[in-house]
Amino acid sequence: MTNQQGRLRTRVAVFACVAAAALIVDQLTKAWAMAALSNGQTIRVIPGLLSFTLVRNPGASLGMGSGATWVISLLAVVACVALAVAGVRTVSMKWSVAISFAFAGALGNLIDRVMYADGFLDGKVVDFLNYGWSVGNVADIYLVVAGVVLVILILMGEPFSHKDLIEQSDESLQSEPEADAK
């Protein structure tokens, strides 16, 4: 096994382990919410800021798209496939971890849409974290955090692919003669 293959295996293993652990936490919290809050009960955690309230959301974030559940489900399938491919293709452990959280969030909500479906791709997501202005779940938190981290990685210029590494290497080699000339 080459060093490159070993690093790929490590990144894939980290991607799989982080995604699996995050997905398990998401699904366990949703199972708890359905068991503890199914009778319409609300549990106040931080008054005025956070409470637990069970909601079955057919739409996307903030309830948008509730009339197009099948479109949202189809987009979630495409997103999961794209994120899995990206998680395997990246050369950066930072990208791999961030993408694994996005994958876990997308897959966690897709699992809900399949498990709690009224028809083909017509399911609802289990939301229970009531912030007062929105109700979400742990998968939503993963998606938001992953999105923020991905933007930070882009802004920091963290290489995603071998091509990015080569371009960064070429740029640093080109700037070295300029530094030597000064």
UniProtKB/Swiss-Prot annotation:
The active site is at 127, 140. GO terms for molecular function: aspartic-type endopeptidase activity. The chain crosses the membrane at residues 12-32, 68-88, 91-111, 135-155. Pathway: Protein modification; lipoprotein biosynthesis (signal peptide cleavage). GO terms for cellular component: plasma membrane. One of its GO terms (biological process) is proteolysis. It catalyses: Release of signal peptides from bacterial membrane prolipoproteins. Hydrolyzes -Xaa-Yaa-Zaa-|-(S,diacylglyceryl)Cys-, in which Xaa is hydrophobic (preferably Leu), and Yaa (Ala or Ser) and Zaa (Gly or Ala) have small, neutral side chains. It is found in: Cell membrane. Its EC number is 3.4.23.36. Keywords: Aspartyl protease, Cell membrane, Hydrolase, Membrane, Protease, Transmembrane, Transmembrane helix. It is a multi-pass membrane protein. InterPro entries: Peptidase_A8. NCBIfam families: lspA, PRK14771.1. This protein specifically catalyzes the removal of signal peptides from prolipoproteins. Belongs to the peptidase A8 family. This is Lipoprotein signal peptidase. The lineage of its organism: Bacteria, Bacillati, Actinomycetota, Actinomycetes, Bifidobacteriales. The gene is lspA.
